[in-house]
Amino acid sequence: MNLELKRFDMKNISFKANESKGPVAVLIGRRDTGKSFLVRDLLYYHQDIPIGTVISGTEEGNGFYGKLVPKLFIHNEYNTAIIENILKRQRGVLTQIKKETEQFKRSTIDPRTFVILDDCLYDNSWSRDKLMRLLFMNGEMFAVVISKEWLVYFTFCF
C-alpha cells in the first residue's frame, strides 16, 4: 500500500488584509503531537498580522507564547471580558475603515488580528459562552482563530 501525501505549505493559508474573511483553525491531537509548533509556524509565516491575543492555560508553566507574542497580549485563563475587548476593538477598527473608505475611497488600516485559545479546557465554561460562538462564527472580523485542544475533551456544540 502506497500513501501519497502532498507537501503542505503554511503560506497557502490566506490571511490577506483585503479579504473579508479569515480562517478558523482547530488543532486536535494528543499531548506532545506538535500542535504548539504548528501554531508557532503559522505565526512565523504570518508575522505581518498587526495584533493578536493568546489565552493559554499553560503559559505560566512553559512560557511558550511569551517568546512569540508580547506578554501584554497573553492571558493565563479564559475570561469573557477578554473576548468582549477583542470584539469591541475589531468593531471599532471596522467602523474606522468604513469611515476612511467613504471619505478617502481607501483605508490604510489593517484589520487583521489573531486569537489563539490554547489548553483552555481545564475550565470548559468558555465552550458554551455566546461570545465564543460569535468569535468562531464571525470570521470576517478576524484573520485567524486557533483552538488547540486534546480530542478527548473537545465537546463543542454549535
Where are these regions (language model features)?
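Short, aromatic/basic amphipathic alpha-helical patches
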Residues: 63-72
